Amino acid sequence: MDENGLDLSLGLPCGGGAASEKSKSGSSSDSKVEEVDRDGKVINDFKNFLDGGTSSQKHDSGVGSQRSDSTKHEGNLLSSINVDVDASKKLNSGGFWVQNDSRPVEVEEDRRADVGDKRKNLFRESSQQKKQEREGHHADTHDKTRTSHISITTDEGSTAENEDVADSETVGSTSRQILQHDESSKRFVGSSGLAEVHKELRSVPASSGVELIGQRRFTISSEKDVKFGNIPYTIPFQGQSINIMNLPYSMPLNSNTVSTTSTTSYPVPGVMQLMATTCVDRPPSHPVIPAYLPLMFGYSSVQLPTLDNDNLHGVASHLLQLHPSHGRGPLGSDKQKDGPNISQAAASSIPHKSSDSVQYDGRAMEHVKGNGRQHKAEETSNSRGEENVKGSNISFRAKDPPDQPRAEAVPSEFSTIRPGLAADLKFGGSGSYPNLPWVSTTGPGPNGRTISGVTYRYSSTQIRIVCACHGSHMSPDDFVRHASVEQTSQEPGTGVSSFPSSNPAASAQS
């Protein structure tokens, strides 16, 4: 008997035949056991051959741990088979073959399970390595793109290549959802593209302007994304000054620096442009005139229109023309639509001194420059109130004595006629001077004399003078000729009508 329990003895012809025959005839079970032992040896040799081929194949594949595992499995398999053979001696042959047939199937299942586990481990290691590489690459690209300009111009060719590479990497992987999440974080996808664009744009420092043309940062992979490649303007951000001069429209701004004193709305072309260009450093290209100041084009300040604060119907144009010589002006210059007004000759006083006339003109100009309000004339007597005409817009207030006579100014072409009374003119009765618009003139020639008269308005364009010597009503020309002729002789063609003989001025004249 050897170590495996097999009978190695051989039958010898000399003396051994009887023993062998005795053993054969003694029990049939011994012969059957020997046959079973031989069959078990053949089976073991066949299994060793199969196991040796499998271990050689695993050795060729380069996995060293698999060979050691297979060797252990072989040792365990042989020991288990020997134990089963020893235990099966007490059993019949049918039960032995049933036990022997089930062992190879279990070994094959165990081997397949081990191979599947190793494959899973290798695939997990490779997937983790790829994931780490992708995360490192994503971090590098994110750091690089933070300092670069952003462009959302779509590139279809690179989009297709990126999608193919992403699909090839995620085929057969159990972490497909994680990869898709990583890819979606890198790109602007679907309807949230515009919101993602604004989020990325906010991460850029505020001091740098972000341009949408010329440079590129990310590529949009979806065909439904919003395309900004054709936008011809730049997007302003915090910290970037907006140049309103380049915009095609005007930006209205509320400003309290310009105030108006009336309800009339007159457009000022330059004001809006000044308001719009206050945001930038450029100076305004057009001068601006505030609405509350009148436009001045070389005219004197006396002739400028002023605002009527008492009347809110608009701008009241009070044009005042003062003649430099004692307030005389053109005839009928203050004609208004509401009716004829008293002329400036009737409104000016008869000063005895030139200084009074200057002060009078200065007061008139000061009133017009100040607030443009109307001033009423002082009524010193009943006769003065009767002479004033209703509807006049501008009157003058002179600080002269109430008993000083007044006279209407004569047109400038009659330079010989001056306001005031003659020095030698005397009145009868109480001897007081009536408060009337007196004028005087001296006739030319050797027979000329100084006469006085009272002016009044004859029509809208003419005035008449009543002489104090005869009480005749005549034109300014006739009044000058009347002073040049002798008192006793009068021209028949002048059409002079005389007052009654009870005229105190005519009777008192020497």
Curated annotation (Swiss-Prot):
Checking InterPro entries in the record gives: Ninja_fam, TDBD
Which family would the database say this protein is a member of? Belongs to the Ninja family.
* Renumbered residue ranges of the record's region Disordered: 1-179, 323-414, 481-510
Q: Which PANTHER family does the record associate with it?
A: AFP HOMOLOG 2 (PTHR31413:SF12)
Any one GO BP annotation for this protein: negative regulation of DNA-templated transcription
Name recorded for this polypeptide: Ninja-family protein mc410
Q: Where is the composition biased (Basic and acidic residues)?
A: 31-44, 103-146, 363-389, 397-406
Under what conditions is it induced? By methyl jasmonate.
Q: Where in the cell is it found?
A: Nucleus
Q: Does the keyword Nucleus apply?
A: yes
Where are the compositionally biased (Low complexity) regions?
Answer: 497-510
Cellular component, GO annotation: nucleus
**Chief localization class?**
nucleus
Q: Where is the composition biased (Polar residues)?
A: 148-160, 485-496
Q: Which Pfam families match?
A: TDBD
What keywords tag this UniProt record? Answer: Nucleus
Q: Where is the signal peptide?
A: none
